[in-house]
UniProtKB/Swiss-Prot annotation:
Disruption phenotype annotation: Does not affect the biosynthesis of penifulvin A.
Disulfide bridge map: none
Record: active site: 164, 411
GO molecular function, one term: acyltransferase activity
Organism lineage string: Eukaryota, Fungi, Dikarya, Ascomycota, Pezizomycotina
The protein, known as: Acetyltransferase peniE
Annotated TM spans: none
Enzyme class: transferase
InterPro entries: CAT-like_dom_sf
Keywords from the named record: Acyltransferase, Transferase
């Protein structure tokens, strides 16, 4: 299958990005089995064996049988690089021993600066564990599709059947905007002016995009000179009980307000609101800091697509075989929730979480998704860069939530071969999310720790890290308690 395919509903912003899921598995796995199962997966889903064609706009891809697999063996233990240092903390705590840059280097090796293969696996075998890293071109799929690929890989390890392969609908000539289920009449009112059409969230064309990228380079230059604080990445652990306590208290506050009494906050809303509020700290003066803060949220809309798009189904609906058909697609819409520094400094965490929930509900509506997909279809040959209102582009925060992807439940026992499995089973003990993109250091990754809590990966300045450490007590979050 050497033909070139183009997804006309994928935002070209994803073209030059790669998404990686690095997994720590608590057993020594058999390299030959892992390699053979990658070959089998590619033979069944040939899009994973294809290459990226960068000469087209937007980028195209081919299907094929390329197997990009590299491995190495290190005479080290897993505790050397992944110490369990969360302890019994009752509130958020930043790791002092896990450095994301060092962790990335343990997963990512033998990777070209601009790899042409769509799918790659890197395996590092330790004395008592295995690091397995799955990488996929972001233009082909998002975080949800990445989890689908890893899940299918584990199904093959267990000798379970996986769905049949199909090309993405928009690579087969369909306009996804015409196949999103739901009407256009359920539109949330916008008294607060929170919601913007997609074209307001993006810099379109070479001139505007280049101007935005120039601002990023200038900001990076000031950091290099020491005129602005540098960003440092860390992992943060949030105990599940603490998240629930904050959520319950915030929900109690909202229930007393008529305009928000029917809104049910999610744990992700609370985590995002807490993060935004704490990194901006308390108000340093009596003045109004109007510095804009853009919070971008990525929404997976694949569930809104009509099932009939999965392979030319009849009007009677998909057949049993077509219901078992799988396609990979970057079905991600990106929307902005707008704040000011003053709001984040002075509004309650419940108010901030409410605004995030309200915006998310609005942007998840089929009408909003349709507008976004139509915008992408219209501009898929243009250069797009997210809009950042502040003069410092590193003030923007983009949320990449992995909390719905249960990597901890994946079973790698089919890859241990003749070795003895650990008493507690062959399981994933740590997940390292990463999307290598043109602008790094702006993403807030959230995922579950497998024990009821949450892990955040993000970058902050030294001042922001200090503020985060000081602002996590219930007394500071809810002063009236």
């Amino acid at each position: 299958m050497s033909a070139e395919y183009t997804c006309r509903s994928t935002n070209p912003w994803a073209d030059s990005s790669t998404i990686y899921a690095g997994l720590v598995v608590n057993a020594v796995l058999d390299l030959d089995i892992l390699h053979e199962k990658q070959k089998e997966l590619i033979s069944l889903w040939p899009i994973l064996g294809g290459t990226v064609v960068q000469s087209t706009k937007p980028w195209s891809f081919t299907c094929g049988s390329n197997v990009d697999f590299e491995s190495r063996t290190l005479d080290e233990t897993v505790s050397t690089h992944f110490p369990n240092n969360w302890g019994n903390m009752t509130g958020p705590s930043a790791s002092t021993t896990l450095d994301p840059a060092i962790v990335d280097a343990k997963f990512l090796f033998a990777i070209k600066p601009a790899p042409s293969t769509i799918f790659r696996i890197r395996v590092t075998v330790l004395r008592d564990a295995t690091l397995v890293c799955f990488g996929i071109t972001h233009q082909v799929t998002g975080a949800g599709g990445c989890f689908e690929v890893v899940s299918a890989f584990c199904d093959l390890l267990a000798n379970r059947a996986i769905p049949h392969f199909a090309l993405p609908p928009d690579a087969r000539g369909l306009k996804l905007s015409d196949h999103i289920t739901g009407g256009d009449d359920n539109v949330t009112s916008d008294e607060l002016g929170d919601f913007e059409p997609p074209e307001k969230n993006w810099n379109i064309g070479v001139v505007k995009a280049a101007t935005m990228m120039w601002r990023v380079l200038i900001a990076q230059f000031w950091k290099t000179l020491g005129l602005r604080e540098k960003l440092t990445e860390k992992y943060i652990h949030l105990p599940g009980d603490w998240v629930d306590e904050v959520r319950n208290q915030a929900q109690k506050e909202l229930s007393s307000l008529p305009e928000s009494s029917d809104v049910e906050l999610t744990r992700n809303d609370i985590i995002s609101a807490w993060y935004l509020k704490t990194i901006h700290g308390p108000s340093s003066s009596s003045g109004c800091d109007t510095t804009p803060v853009d919070f971008y949220v990525a929404i997976n809309y694949k569930g809104l697509l009509n099932p009939n798009t999965t392979g030319g189904c009849s009007e009677k609906g998909p057949s049993a075989e077509q219901q078992q058909t799988q396609y990979l697609h970057h079905s991600v819409a990106i929307f902005r929730c707008m704040f000011s520094a003053y709001q984040l400094q002075n509004d309650s965490i419940s108010s901030i979480a409410w605004r995030i929930r309200r915006a998310t509900l609005h942007y998840k509506q089929p009408s909003s998704i349709k507008k976004y997909v139509r915008f992408v279809e219209k501009n898929n040959s243009n250069l797009l860069v997210v809009d950042i209102r502040a003069s410092n582009p590193f003030s923007m925060v983009g949320l990449s939530s992995w909390t719905t992807y249960n990597y901890m439940a994946l079973d790698f026992s089919g890859a241990i071969g003749d070795r003895k499995a650990p008493q507690d089973g062959v399981r994933v003990t740590f997940v390292n999310p990463l999307a290598l993109s043109p602008i790094s250091g702006l993403t807030l990754y959230t995922l579950k720790d497998g024990k009821g809590g949450y892990v955040i990966r993000t970058a902050n300045t030294k001042t922001q890290w200090k503020q985060l450490e000081k602002s996590s007590s219930m007394e500071n979050l809810f002063p009236v308690l």
